[in-house]
């Protein structure tokens, strides 16, 4: 084989190998922070699922604390631990869902107040997409809220938010 043919053959083999690597299915890792192993083995759900650079955190009940605000703060601290298990941070969170125990709209709005406060402590800028839902009950009795999240590892390193501030509200005549 001529040197030119050998070089072309090598390039084709390398290109084929690179293509095979880029089209391979991402890895899927089931993870659980210390203390959450029972979720996987007894209740049969994965606390943290890592697929490639995507991290999915199952619902974390706000179960520990003296009041709703403390319980919610505990849940966000647990979220940090869950993300860390997969190599992600709070800055990498791209979506947040929260499920709030409430019997009607008025109670939902009231119970959302401590969530808004604590959410602001953990997300100071470049906020994730967020959906808050009222529900009559959660699996963990006494938990006022449960949070789940999705993150993309590394996405929080250089976020960009080009959203202008709204104009101040105008007084009503």
Name what the model sees in each region.
Residues 1-7:
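Bacterial N-terminal signal peptides that target proteins for export
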